[in-house]
C-alpha cells in the first residue's frame, strides 16, 4: 500500500494580518519618541525635549490624521484601507492608545523629569511654593506684562462662546457676583496671550542662585480675579482645543498663493478634534466645553499638568544636561579648494548631514551668486525658513543679474506662510518664482548652476534627500551630492524645464523621478532580486526610508521574501508591512532608529548579483511620494561612495543595539538593546566619530 504524503498549504493571511494600519503605526512611532524621555542614554534636558517633541508630533497627528479620519466617519465615507479597518475602528484604537500615551507622558514629567530637574537646581514653582518676595514679583509681572494683553470674555446671551484659535491656551473661569452693569455672570473665558512665554524665569536675586520658573498658566490662575473687578473667581481651569488643520485646495484655482492665504486663515478655526483640560477641571465644566466644541467624551484628554506641553521651553543654563556639542566636518577637498567649482570638477562630493556640514551647499550658492561667470541658478525649495540664508543669497544673485529660478512648494504642510513670504522676497529681487505643478507637490531637492567656462556652458548640481534648511541640517540625517556629472546635470535641467514649462514628460538618462518612472523601476529592481533568488543566487535588499505604506511595493517585498530574498528595512516612522509571518515575510526584518538626530535619509540598496545598485532619494515609499509628488532618485555610481553609503548609512544602522527597535509580526515594537556579551553599538554616535 502506497502512503500519500500531503504537503501543508502555505498560510493564507487576510488584510488585517498582512498589513499594519497607517494611523496606528504613526502612533507607535510617537510612542518610541516618548520612550526617549526615560532612556538613560539621554541627558536630562534632552529627555525633556523628547517629551515636547512627542507633544508636537501628537498635535500634528490630531490636526491631520485624526481630523481626516473623523471626516470620513462623519461623512460616512466607505474608505478602503489596506488593513481593512473602518474609520470607526481606527478612531477607537487611536483613542485608547493616545489616552494611555498621554497619561504616561505626564507621569514621566511629574515623577521623573521635574524631580530630577529640581535636584539640578531647576524648579517649576507652584503657587503655594513662592516666597512673599517671589509672589510680589509675580504679581507685578502679571500687572505689567500679562494683564494688558488679556481679554476676558464673559459668557451670556450678548457674549456667546468665542471662537478660540487652534492649540491656544485658554482658561474657563467660574464667577460669583455682579459686573459693572449689574449682570450676574457665572462663566467667562480668558485666552492666554500667545505672544507671552509659557515659562517665566524668576530673577536670580529672588532664587538664591537657583533657576526657578513659574508657568504663565499659574500666574494667570493666581491673579485671574483682577480681570473681573468686584467679582470673585471661584474656579479657574486650563483648556486647549485641537482643530482640523488640513488644507483643501481645488485644482482649478487661478492664484495658488492667494487661495492658500484664504485657507490658512480658516485653519485656525477648523473643526475641533480634541479637548485637553487639567485633571482638576470639574465634570460639569468639561461637559460644558465638550458641548460647545461638539465633541464626545472619548475626545476629552484630562492631563496632570500644563495642557500645552509643546511650548514648555526655556533657555536652561545647564549645558552639561544636554548632548555634547557637535561641530560638523567639512570634507578635506573643500577645505583645500579656493573655489567650490574647481573642487567639484575634481570629483563628486558626498555630504552626510549633520555629521558633515551643510555649509558647502550654502557655499555653492554664495559663490555662484558672486561669480561673474555664472549665468543661472535654479533651485527647488520645500522647507527653507522665512529668514533663510539661502533665500537671501538667491535674492542677491537675482539682484546681481543672474537668471534665478526658484520652484517653491507653497503647500509644504505648516510652512505655507513661510513659503509665501519666501516667494515674495525672491520675486521682489527679480527672480522667476513658480509654484510647481497643481495637484503634485514638488518635493525633489535640486540645485543647478550654469557657468561659462572656456566659451562653453558647464553645469553644476546638488541633489539631496533633505530640505534646504540650514537649521534642520543640524538635527536631521540626510545625504547630498555635489556633482558635475553632465548626464545627471542634464537630467536636473530637464526636470526644471518640466516644472517651469508645460511640456510632456521628459526622458532622463540617470535619474528616476516620480510620479513617472520611480515606482515602476523600484518594482523592477525587486523583481530582479526575485529572479536571482529563484536561480539560487544571493539576493538582498536594504531600504532605509521614513515611511513604508505603498501596498504594491509591500506586496512585491512579500513576494521577494517568499522567493528567498533577504530583506532589511530601516523605517523611522510608519511601516504598514508586517515582517516575520511564516510563508509570507519570514525573510524580512524591520527596524526603526530613534535617537539624537531625526533619521531622514532615503537609501535604496539592491545586491543585483554583486553589481550593487545604490540610490539616494527624496522619496519615501508612500503613495503620495510615488504618485502625487515630484521626487528625484539619484544613482550612486562611484564605487567608493557606494561603499561609504553601504558601510556608514546602512550596515552601521543594522548593527545598532542602542537606539534601534525591531518590529514584531504581531505589529508591536521591541527595543533592541545589547546584552552583556554584546558590544554596544550606537549608529549615530559612531558617525559622529567616524566621518572624515
Swiss-Prot record:
Its cofactor is Mg(2+). Gene3D superfamilies: Endonuclease Chain A, Polyphosphate kinase middle domain, Polyphosphate kinase N-terminal domain. ATP binds at residues 57, 476, 572, 600. It holds the Pfam family PP_kinase_C. Its EC number is 2.7.4.1. An intermediate of this reaction is the autophosphorylated ppk in which a phosphate is covalently linked to a histidine residue through a N-P bond. It catalyses: [phosphate](n) + ATP = [phosphate](n+1) + ADP. The keyword Glycoprotein does not apply. GO terms for molecular function: ATP binding; metal ion binding; polyphosphate kinase activity. Mg(2+) binds at residues 383, 413. It comes from the Bacteria. The keyword Transferase applies. Keywords: ATP-binding, Kinase, Magnesium, Metal-binding, Nucleotide-binding, Phosphoprotein, Transferase. GO terms for biological process: polyphosphate biosynthetic process. The active site is at 443 (phosphohistidine intermediate). GO terms for cellular component: polyphosphate kinase complex. InterPro entries: PP_kinase, PP_kinase_C_1, PP_kinase_middle, PP_kinase_middle_dom_sf, PPK_C_dom2, PPK_N_dom, PPK_N_dom_sf. NCBIfam families: poly_P_kin, PRK05443.1-1, PRK05443.1-2, PRK05443.2-2. Catalyzes the reversible transfer of the terminal phosphate of ATP to form a long-chain polyphosphate (polyP). Belongs to the polyphosphate kinase 1 (PPK1) family. PANTHER family: POLYPHOSPHATE KINASE (PTHR30218:SF0). This is Polyphosphate kinase.
Amino acid at each position: 500500500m502506497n502512503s500519500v504524503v500531503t504537503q501543508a498549504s502555505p498560510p493564507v493571511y487576510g488584510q488585517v494580518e498582512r498589513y499594519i494600519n497607517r494611523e496606528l503605526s504613526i502612533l507607535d512611532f510617537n510612542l518610541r519618541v516618548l520612550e526617549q524621555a526615560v532612556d538613560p542614554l539621554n541627558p536630562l534636558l534632552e529627555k525633556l525635549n523628547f517629551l515636547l517633541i512627542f507633544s508636537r508630533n501628537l498635535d500634528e497627528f490630531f490636526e491631520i490624521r485624526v481630523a481626516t479620519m473623523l471626516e470620513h466617519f462623519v461623512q460616512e465615507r466607505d474608505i478602503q484601507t489596506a488593513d481593512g479597518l473602518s474609520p470607526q475602528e481606527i478612531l477607537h484604537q487611536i483613542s485608547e492608545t493616545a489616552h494611555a500615551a498621554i497619561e504616561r507622558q505626564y507621569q514621566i514629567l511629574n515623577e521623573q523629569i521635574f524631580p530630577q530637574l529640581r535636584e539640578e537646581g531647576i524648579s517649576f514653582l507652584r503657587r503655594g511654593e513662592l516666597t512673599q518676595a517671589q509672589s510680589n514679583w509675580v504679581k507685578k509681572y502679571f500687572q505689567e506684562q500679562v494683564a494688558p494683553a488679556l481679554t476676558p470674555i464673559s459668557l451670556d446671551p450678548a457674549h456667546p462662546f468665542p471662537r478660540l484659535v487652534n492649540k491656544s491656551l485658554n482658561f474657563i473661569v467660574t464667577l460669583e457676583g455682579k459686573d459693572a452693569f449689574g449682570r450676574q455672570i457665572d462663566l467667562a473665558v480668558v485666552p492666554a496671550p500667545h505672544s507671552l512665554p509659557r515659562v517665566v524665569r524668576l530673577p536670580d536675586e529672588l532664587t538664591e542662585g537657583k533657576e526657578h520658573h513659574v508657568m504663565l498658566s499659574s500666574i494667570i490662575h493666581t491673579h485671574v480675579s483682577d480681570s473681573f473687578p468686584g467679582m470673585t473667581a471661584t474656579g479657574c481651569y486650563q483648556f486647549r482645543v485641537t482643530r482640523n488643520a488640513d488644507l483643501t485646495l481645488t485644482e482649478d484655482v487661478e492664484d495658488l498663493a492667494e487661495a492658500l492665504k484664504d485657507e490658512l486663515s480658516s485653519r485656525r478655526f477648523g473643526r475641533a478634534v480634541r479637548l485637553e483640560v487639567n485633571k482638576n477641571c470639574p465634570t460639569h465644566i468639561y461637559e460644558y466645553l465638550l458641548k460647545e466644541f461638539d465633541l464626545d467624551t472619548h475626545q476629552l484628554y484630562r492631563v496632570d499638568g500644563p495642557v500645552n506641553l509643546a511650548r514648555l521651553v526655556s533657555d536652561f543654563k545647564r549645558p552639561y544636561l544636554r548632548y555634547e556639542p557637535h561641530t560638523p566636518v567639512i570634507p578635506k577637498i573643500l577645505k583645500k579648494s579656493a573655489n567650490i567649482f574647481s573642487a567639484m570638477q575634481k570629483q563628486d562630493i558626498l555630504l552626510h548631514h549633520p555629521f558633515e556640514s551643510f555649509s558647502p551647499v550654502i557655499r555653492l550658492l554664495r559663490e555662484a551668486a558672486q561669480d561673474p561667470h555664472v549665468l543661472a541658478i535654479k533651485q527647488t525649495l520645500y522647507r527653507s525658513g522665512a529668514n533663510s540664508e539661502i533665500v537671501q543669497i538667491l535674492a542677491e544673485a537675482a539682484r546681481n543679474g543672474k537668471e534665478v529660478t526658484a520652484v517653491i512648494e507653497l503647500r509644504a504642510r505648516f510652512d505655507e506662510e513661510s513659503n509665501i513670504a519666501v516667494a515674495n522676497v525672491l520675486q521682489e529681487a527679480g527672480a522667476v518664482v513658480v509654484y510647481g505643478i497643481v495637484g503634485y507637490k514638488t518635493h525633489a531637492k535640486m540645485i543647478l548652476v550654469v557657468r561659462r567656462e572656456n566659451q562653453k556652458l558647464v553645469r553644476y548640481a546638488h541633489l539631496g534627500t533633505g530640505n534646504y534648511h540650514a537649521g534642520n541640517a543640524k538635527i536631521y540625517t540626510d545625504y547630498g551630492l555635489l556633482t558635475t556629472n553632465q548626464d545627471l546635470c542634464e537630467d536636473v535641467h530637464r526636470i526644471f524645464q518640466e516644472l517651469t514649462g508645460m511640456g510632456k514628460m521628459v526622458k532622463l538618462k540617470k535619474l528616476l523621478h516620480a510620479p513617472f518612472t520611480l515606482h515602476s523601476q523600484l518594482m523592477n529592481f525587486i523583481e530582479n532580486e526575485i529572479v536571482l533568488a529563484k536561480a539560487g543566487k544571493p539576493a538582498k535588499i536594504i531600504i532605509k526610508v521614513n515611511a513604508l505604506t505603498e501596498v504594491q511595493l509591500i506586496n512585491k517585498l512579500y513576494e521577494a521574501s517568499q522567493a528567498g530574498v533577504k530583506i532589511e528595512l530601516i523605517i523611522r516612522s510608519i511601516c504598514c508591512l508586517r515582517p516575520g509571518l511564516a510563508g509570507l515575510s519570514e525573510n524580512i526584518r524591520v527596524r526603526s532608529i530613534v535617537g539624537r538626530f531625526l533619521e531622514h535619509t532615503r537609501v535604496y540598496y539592491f545586491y543585483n548579483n554583486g553589481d550593487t545598485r545604490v540610490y539616494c532619494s527624496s522619496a519615501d515609499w508612500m503613495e503620495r511620494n510615488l504618485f502625487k509628488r515630484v521626487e528625484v532618485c539619484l544613482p550612486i555610481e562611484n564605487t567608493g561612495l557606494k561603499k561609504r553609503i553601504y558601510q556608514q548609512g546602512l550596515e552601521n544602522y543594522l548593527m545598532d543595539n542602542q537606539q534601534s527597535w525591531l518590529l514584531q509580526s504581531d505589529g508591536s515594537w521591541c527595543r533592541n538593546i545589547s546584552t552583556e556579551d554584546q558590544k554596544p553599538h550606537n549608529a549615530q554616535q559612531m558617525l559622529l566619530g567616524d566621518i572624515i
